Amino acid sequence: MMSHIRLVLCSALLSMMSCPTSGTIGEMLSLAASSNSSICHGMQFTEPTESFMGILPNETLPMFIFSIMHSEAVPKVGKTLRISHDMKLFGGEAVNYMIFVNKILYEPISYYNYTGSCRQQGLSSCVRVYSDLVNGSKGNPSVKLGFTAIELNKTKNTDFHNLGFKICFSCRDHNGIRLVVYNKNNRTAQLMMCPSELIFSQDFTINSTSVNPSEEAAVPLLNVTGYTCIALHNKNMLTHHSPALSSGSKVDNTLEPGCDSNVGLFGHSTGTDYGWGLANFFSAGITNSLQISQLEHVTDAIACKIAKTSNYTTTALFLLNKEEGEIRDHVIEHEVALNYLLAHQGGLCSVVKGPMCCSDIDDFRRNVSDMIDKVHEEMKKFYHEPDPFGGLGTWGFYGTIFGHVLQWIPIIIMVVVVCFVCSWVRK
């Protein structure tokens, strides 16, 4: 019964929301999983510092550059678009901007004499942008943004009356900040948009003449309000910004073919010292060389075991690091999806209250990857010294027998000498 009620509620919630454009949710989720993915609330907002709206003759070259700033901020020198943040989409900390394009204007030649006009500034056409269309931009006067005739002529056709420019919102990466456009009217979000309601008769037609030389010629634009550009910002972007493991860290399990990691451990007691002492006495110190040889073999085996253990450990860390990163990305994706679905209610934290709503998931994948790389660099410092007697190994079993015979020849000679001395003394 409860599952049926939940299904009905979910269906009702989805029916309240307009169907988003194709790929909208996928774009937001892929954005959340990217290097600029946000932490707090799934979306943590900052005020954009550069323009993300312009009149574009094509998709690559903006016709003019202007900045976007807070309505209470001090205007910058140059073309500045001041836009109020009349809507808090995802909570009180968000700085969201509404953009209103009212009409496109052409100033007659007589406007050369008007101080501050586009014509007087050497510009030939303008777009009047309002920061608050409903309240008549109270406290925030409208701003006209213009572009030069040279720029207009770049796309001029045979009929110079029709120049065909579109007003588009571009919310692609800009100076390291990625933006998303959210439309509060139909509750859709896109990374880049030039919707049909922003286009008048397919393209804007900027007339080069006016019926009344003392008035502006205006082409009205309808249904263009209600768009908000949202800046997604990762607060860890200065320290842990890049995706982890992007440096191509690879686990190297290759060791020398002759690497033997079997280490024999012997118990040590007082009797051990006595035994080796007697052996050294009767063998005239020959057993010392045997001990040194055995110690060298054990040292090599220990180094080999350290290298293998290090590789196994770094492999485990590599996989755990990758798994933790994937879990973190999925958590952020789910937070963004919840914020997207609950946007009309103020976001996830407006519905679910509590101190843990803002989940701060630090991203240390890069740090772990760097440590793994350092371990690999240290392990590369292990190297094999050439064995001056390595050639004997090619003799196989006979080489081993020959080596043992050589070790016992001094002892055999000493026994023969002692026997000879004893026989001589008896005589």
UniProtKB/Swiss-Prot annotation:
Which residues have a glycan attached per UniProt?
36, 113, 135, 153, 186, 207, 223, 311, 367
Entry-linked SUPFAM superfamilies: Virus ectodomain
Q: Which InterPro entries match?
A: TLV/ENV_coat_polyprotein (IPR018154)
Note the Gene3D superfamilies from the entry: 1.10.287.210
What ranges does the Extracellular topological domain annotation cover? Answer: 2-50, 110-400
Q: Among the record's GO biological process terms, what is one?
A: symbiont entry into host cell
Which residue ranges does the entry give as Cytoplasmic-facing topology? Answer: 72-88, 422-427
Please tell me whether the keyword Transmembrane is annotated for this protein: yes
GO terms under cellular component: host cell plasma membrane; membrane; viral envelope; virion membrane
Give the stretches traversing the membrane: 51-71, 89-109, 401-421
Could you list this entry's UniProt keywords, alphabetically sorted: Fusion of virus membrane with host endosomal membrane, Fusion of virus membrane with host membrane, Glycoprotein, Host cell membrane, Host membrane, Host-virus interaction, Membrane, Transmembrane, Transmembrane helix, Viral attachment to host cell, Viral envelope protein, Viral penetration into host cytoplasm, Virion, Virus entry into host cell
The lineage's top-level taxon is Viruses
Q: Which PANTHER family match?
A: VIRAL ENVELOPE PROTEIN (PTHR10424)
- What function does this protein fulfil? mediates virus attachment to host receptor and fusion of viral and host membrane.
Similarity-based family: Belongs to the reptarenavirus GPC protein family.
- Name of the protein this chain belongs to: Glycoprotein
Q: Which organism is it from?
A: Alethinophid 1 reptarenavirus (isolate AlRrV1/Boa/USA/BC/2009)
